[in-house]
């Protein structure tokens, strides 16, 4: 049986080119299997050699057109993806965009996803008790007067807006009629409010035409009484031992401040919110995770390195940029590449005005002028030095 210090020294000696994370993982696994199978030094060396060989085989060849390979590897499975919006797996009440529309949404770096949602994990105190989890959900869930109303009526004769509140919904939201009235009175100074049991009557203080009443009624209905802005309904689900809250809508910055929420695990599917709150590295990881999860939902397997390349390019400048005419492609350093993409004359005029120089370092610009592209064997520049003829031969000539 080999000692742990010998294993460590063999890894350092034979696997010097391996990344630290791979070395550490290899060391831990060798220690584990050494205890189980009593490995010899020769066996340990063979295992390390195999790992090094596999690692080198996994590396990208110099000059490989990684962008083209990534585009093909993501594009081909995407043709088999569905074009529909599905219910989120396991949460039938919440609609979430999946499939190809979600992939397009991510790579286009849309500011607002079509179906934003958050997965809110809870802290030690709240995660094992359903009542406590629902209490946190009530703090998060955005509640408007419309959510609490059983019926709403516009009385044009008396110029009143009448709202019948549902007592069950009111109790579930954790509000009371007094609280509702107080919140509305503080927000709408131009209206009078009257309460009769579970009925709320709203009258404008001044009005000139019926449209004023309609406008006031719409504003009162949509007024948020509690919860986070941008968040609609919440659903509490049990996953394993703990309760998790799913939300329709997203307000990542505010949800992390809610008492009872675990800020280290809570997630949103809005990439821009993640970049704003947690930084660009977190946004990069979110892009990778979202695309990989969307692919897996459809039963498609794509090598994560292709997705990582896309995420790297999108977040290269410290902001999340789309892949397209308004982002990565439209901002290429090469004038000819930009001109070849679209709006040719405008790009050429602007570049001439600025005095730009094209170093012909990319593929498109070299294809345009008929040069070998700097990919694969085209990256290598050979110069051949011919042997000099001896002095005697020169004299004979």
Swiss-Prot record:
GO terms for biological process: DNA-templated transcription. One of its GO terms (cellular component) is cytoplasm. One of its GO terms (molecular function) is DNA binding. The keyword DNA damage does not apply. It is found in: Cytoplasm. It comes from the Archaea. It catalyses: RNA(n) + a ribonucleoside 5'-triphosphate = RNA(n+1) + diphosphate. Its EC number is 2.7.7.6. CDD domains: RNAP_A. Disulfide bonds: none annotated. Keywords: Cytoplasm, DNA-binding, DNA-directed RNA polymerase, Nucleotidyltransferase, Transcription, Transferase. The keyword Protein transport does not apply. HAMAP family: RNApol_arch_Rpo1C. DNA-dependent RNA polymerase (RNAP) catalyzes the transcription of DNA into RNA using the four ribonucleoside triphosphates as substrates. Forms part of the jaw domain. NCBIfam families: RNA_pol_rpoA2. Belongs to the RNA polymerase beta' chain family. This is DNA-directed RNA polymerase subunit Rpo1C.
């Amino acid at each position: 049986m080999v000692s742990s210090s010998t294993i460590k020294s063999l890894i350092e000696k034979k696997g010097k080119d391996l990344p630290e994370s791979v070395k550490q993982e290899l060391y831990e696994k060798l220690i584990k299997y050494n205890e189980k199978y009593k490995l010899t030094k020769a066996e340990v060396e063979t295992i390390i050699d195999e790992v090094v060989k596999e690692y080198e085989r996994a590396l990208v060849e110099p000059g490989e057109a990684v962008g083209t390979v990534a585009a093909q590897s993501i594009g081909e499975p995407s043709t088999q993806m569905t074009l529909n919006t599905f219910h989120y797996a396991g949460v039938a009440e919440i609609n979430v965009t999946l499939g190809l529309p979600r992939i397009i949404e991510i790579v286009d770096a849309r500011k607002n996803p079509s179906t934003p949602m958050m997965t809110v994990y809870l802290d030690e105190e709240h995660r094992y008790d359903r009542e406590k989890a629902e209490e946190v959900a009530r703090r998060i869930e955005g509640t408007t007067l419309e959510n609490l109303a059983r019926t709403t009526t516009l009385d044009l004769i008396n110029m009143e807006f009448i709202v019948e509140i549902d007592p069950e919904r009111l109790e579930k939201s954790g509000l009371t009629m007094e609280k509702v009235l107080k919140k509305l009175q503080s927000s709408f100074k131009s209206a009078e409010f009257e309460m009769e049991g579970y009925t709320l009557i709203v009258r404008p203080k001044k009005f000139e035409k019926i449209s004023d009443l309609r406008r006031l009624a719409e504003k009162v209905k949509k007024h948020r009484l509690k919860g986070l802005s941008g968040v609609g309904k919440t659903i509490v689900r049990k996953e394993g031992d703990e309760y998790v809250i799913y939300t329709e809508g997203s307000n990542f910055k505010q949800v992390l401040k809610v008492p009872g929420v675990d800020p280290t695990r809570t997630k949103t599917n809005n990439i821009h919110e993640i970049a704003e709150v947690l930084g660009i590295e977190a946004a990069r990881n979110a892009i990778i995770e979202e695309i990989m999860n969307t692919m897996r939902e459809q039963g498609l397997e794509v090598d994560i390195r292709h997705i990582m390349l896309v995420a790297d390019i999108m977040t290269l400048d410290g902001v999340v940029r789309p892949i397209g005419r308004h982002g990565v492609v439209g901002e290429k350093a090469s004038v000819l590449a930009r001109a070849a993409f679209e709006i040719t004359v405008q790009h050429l005029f602007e570049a001439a005005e600025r005095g730009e120089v094209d170093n012909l370092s990319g593929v498109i610009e070299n294809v345009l002028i008929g040069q070998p592209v700097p990919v694969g064997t085209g990256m290598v520049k050979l110069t051949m030095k011919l042997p000099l003829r001896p002095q005697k031969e020169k004299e004979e000539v």
